[in-house]
Amino acid sequence: MKKLILILALLIGNICFASEVMILHTSDTHGRISPIEYNGVKNMGGFSKRLVFVNEIRNKNKNVLLLDSGDYFQGSIYYRIDYGKRIAKLLPDIKYDAIALGNHEFDNGTKVLKHNIKNSKTQFLSANVHFKDRYLKNAVKPYIIKEFDGERFLIIGVTTSSLANLSDTNNITVTNPIDEINKIIKQVKYDRLIILSHCGLDEDRQIAKAIPSIDLILGGHNHYFFQTTERVGNVPIVQDGEFGIRVGELKFDKNLKSYTYKNMTPELISDANVDKKIEKINHHIKKVTSEVLANSQIVLIGNQSTLEHNQTNLGKLVLTSMAKAFPEYDAVLTNSGSIRVNRNLKGNITYADVLEILPFDNDIVMVEIQGKHLNEVLFHGQQQNRRYLQYYVKDKKIDNNKVYKVITNSYIAQGKDGYDNFKYGKVVKKSPVPPTKLLIQTLKEMQVITDKKLNFENL
């Protein structure tokens, strides 16, 4: 009888008390391995502080998962110097369980992605991106399973289905994430289902609605800082911001028990060995990028929160440099998402600043487009969240029937970022000079930046 009671007690214990798992979550680091100034606060974030915090949690908890929702490499000077090689080589120190593929992982094609995955020694996930390359076919998995005290956690990675509209999608095929998740959950035995997503909140909501058995969606792509989880039915969704500013903490037993987060604030301790590695990288960057190109007597507004919703003088500086590609232009425009310095600038402007201002390698092109379609482009650009258009048009009023010569970047000229009205235009010229070089030339010519010099009427 005693033996029977003991067996029943064990069974009841197993049913009622699932093991607690601590899930740590990050997203949209965009190559910020050193601390940055964020919203006016210096020394925020940084890979080294993140590492120390993660290891503290691991030391205090038996079961820990460390997951990232993608866009890990591209977007800073650290990426520009070697396409992410040095960023990737830091990843083995922190030991992520998995990172979802974000759209910016593809900005320089699958060859660069392959090298970064090899150097990172980290498992990357995407169930709905399919590769032609043999190495990437094997290296990027659709899912992983992590077992804690007999409970199987199925973690499926998904990437935005709009990938073709956002990045270089040569040599890959992108399928519907909902379809791919459904295929996997029919085939794999699991107890808990986590979606590691770089789809964006709207698509995550669709996934949650379509598959209500999901236990948790860890999201990214929008750069949102959630204060609490959002729920679609019983499915919790969370995002943990950008640039390594914070780490999300989710306690999980049978269900999500709690969600909080830790901001990587200036006073947090960093790891001495990692600090040495990053200092070595910084020394290399300083050596090759410290040349002063100009001095700004005005504050150039580059913080993302302002750029997302307004035209700024830094945007005007970038447009001024683009205009030098084709002097016969009628209009010049670029999406604010192409400008990523995320801080205001004053005083000496260096080569390093240029690489942060323009981290992407898009060509400068001239598009011939009818006035009515140009109006549609401008209208769209003023409705965008996080992608507000920086632009200048010579005509005070656009003639719907006139054909305009418009300078822009190849990214939105291809209709990406929702600028599909460019399909009515035609690319007639491509500048042989990259945008960073045009900006460097412009800064050297200006020497001193003033409001007057940023007035297009004075060019």
Please tell me what each predicted stretch does.
Residues V433-K437, Q441-L459:
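Protruding loop/beta-arch "assembly-hinge" segments enriched in small, turn-prone residues
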Residues L8-A9, C199, G347-I349:
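Short, motif-level signal for alpha-helix interfacial/capping segments enriched in acidic residues
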Residues A18-I269, H309-K324, V332-T334, Y351, ...:
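Acidic, metal/ion-coordinating pockets
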Residues N14-S19, V288-T289:
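Extreme N-terminus of proteins, especially the signal/transit-peptide cleavage junction
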